[in-house]
Amino acid sequence: VDLDDLLEKGERFYKLYHDSLNFVTPGNSNVDSIRMMVIVHYTTTWTAYGGGYDDVIGALWVNPATMKPVGQTIAHEFGHSFQYQVYCDDPNKEAGFRQGQSGTSQDGNSFWEMCAQHMAWQNIALFPEWNCDVPIYLANHHRGFMHEWLRYQAFYLMEYWRMKHGEDMLGRVWRESESHEDPITAYKRIAGLSQDQFNAEVWESACHDITWDYPLGGYLRRIVDRQSEADRQTWYTHKT
């Protein structure tokens, strides 16, 4: 394992999520006094989990195969560590979307995954070969937001939020969320939007998807342009 690569990129991920995306509030976070830990398990079993310890501090567990080189996987899982930290830092223990899709803690929550992908995407200059799962997104983008089939791919609406409201908007949605609140309900409340206004934003966001009209859209356009016409047609064909 190239530990220097892990430390260098890990520090960059940390700085982005801490200083720019504002998943924590300096001066009011446990990270002010406690270090997040990265635990490397020397096993051949694929291991890449972001979370934390005892609702106190975020952490990351990985094995060597996930770090050759350090890239999207570590950036994504480190995102989970910061998502975990949101609940740790909330004195009321309400923020951070700890509930699952059904409103309980017994099932998954795709918002965690799509947000971690969005956080990783902000670092794509460090791993430009990542294809962002564009084929899966193009074949399924007609599905609803937070659909389980798009839990790793549907992060472009959050990029629209970043463009419209600023780099820290996603962090605000996490930090200012309320217990068992739906992520979209939280966003509408924080942004002060009615349902009709939110619907208009979804339409505008979809318009950006047509040509990948985002600050990092050049990476996506290159992914599509490298493919054959037949492959592109397959990507754009909805199977259901």
Regions found by a protein language model. Name each.
Residues 1-57, 61-78, 82-92, 195:
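Zn2+-dependent metallopeptidase catalytic core
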Residues 90-104, 140-143, 208, 229-237:
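Surface-exposed intrinsically disordered loops and tails
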